[in-house]
Amino acid sequence: MRLLTVVLLLPLLIICHEHSHHHHDDEGSAVLTKVGLDDHELHEHDHDHDHDHKILRWDEKKNHSSHEKVPHSQLSTLKVWVFSLSAVIGISLAPCTLLFFIPAQHANGPFLKILLAFGAGGLLGDALLHIIPHSLNPHSHGAHDHDHAHSHDHAHNDHSHDHSDQLRVGIYVIAGILVFMMVEQLVRIIKGGHCHSHENGHIVADEHRHLNDDHHHHHNGEKKQEVEGLKDIKASAYLNLVADFVHNMTDGLAIGASFSAGSTLGWVTTLTVLLHELPHEVGDFAILVQSGFSKYQAIRMQAVTALGAITGCIFSLLISNPVLSAEGDTGAIMPFTAGGFIYIATVSVIPELLESGDHNNMSKVAKMAQSLVHLIAICMGVGMMYIVSLVE
């Protein structure tokens, strides 16, 4: 009987308990409603309050840690100048030293043609795989996560802004091609057309003919040929020197800004620029020799273009502009230079490779083999710049 009573009363007690608990929750909700809050708002308030505290603690920790790291990464003004200029001078001297070990050959020498093909590949790779991609995306991807929360509000504006920047880079590249074309045409008009690329074989033949005329007038003949050779230097050589000077200036800007940001970043940028400049300077040397310079004249002119790197470095250190970041974001200069490199490679260098077999009595098989070697050299130049871009 007692057991039956307990079984009958137990559900009733459970129902009363649940009703009392629900009534208590209703009273709590009513109190919150009277003060102008509901459960959802209270939850949001607690969440936001806790979130704000977390953000505050994280910001304090971040600022504290960054405050501790700054003295270790920053350099004094004197060290920044010494390190930056030393790095630029070292990068400028290293390729010039390497050029002394390249054997001197006349303009139609097979080894020089291979270097010329390597230089064409380096110019195209530098322009299309390094300079233009960098100009299209000059900023780091580290800000992606920070801006992700605002992507829904600004997606359309960001897309329009990026598209206009990409179009602007393309316009600068085209402008570089057109300006270099007009400069070469102007040089040809001023020099009376004596710098046309098809005359190179006749110039070399005339040089050998004069050398074999009379041994008694050998030294006078060499001096006369050197003077005449300077007059017959192709316009592509001058265009290449201008492009190198501007390109070296951007490298100097990058190195100066990198050492201003910290010693580690400065030396990493220096190593990257050095790896980039070594194959580039070898190709430029081949272009200058092919255009009419002697070996030592080409080396001297390469040293002159190195003044662009020193100028850019000094300019970067003087203005200390954060806009000139470690990546060397220099607006229109880089894509304009890329256009110049594309013009030199496609208009001045590659046609020389296509005509190289016409100056020699070579069989068709030998010409095909020579073309294959040139193609491999071009691919090696492009591949070198691709590797440098990946490392950078």
From Swiss-Prot:
Its main location: membrane. Glycans are attached at N63, N248, N361. It is a multi-pass membrane protein. Residues 142-162 have a biased composition (Basic and acidic residues). The keyword Repressor does not apply. One of its GO terms (biological process) is regulation of egg-laying behavior. GO terms for molecular function: zinc ion transmembrane transporter activity. Residues 139-162 are annotated as: Disordered. The chain crosses the membrane at residues 82-102, 114-134, 170-190, 255-275, 304-324, 331-351, 371-391. It is found in: Membrane. Belongs to the ZIP transporter (TC 2.A.5) family. KE4/Catsup subfamily. Zinc transporter which regulates intracellular zinc levels. Required for spermatogenesis in both hermaphrodites and males where it resides in an inactive form in immature sperm, spermatids, but is likely activated in response to reduced spe-4 and spe-6 function. Upon activation, mediates the release of zinc from internal stores in spermatids into the cytoplasm. The resulting increase in cytoplasmic zinc levels promotes spermatid activation and subsequent differentiation into mature motile sperm that are capable of fertilization. This is Zinc transporter zipt-7.1. It comes from Caenorhabditis briggsae.
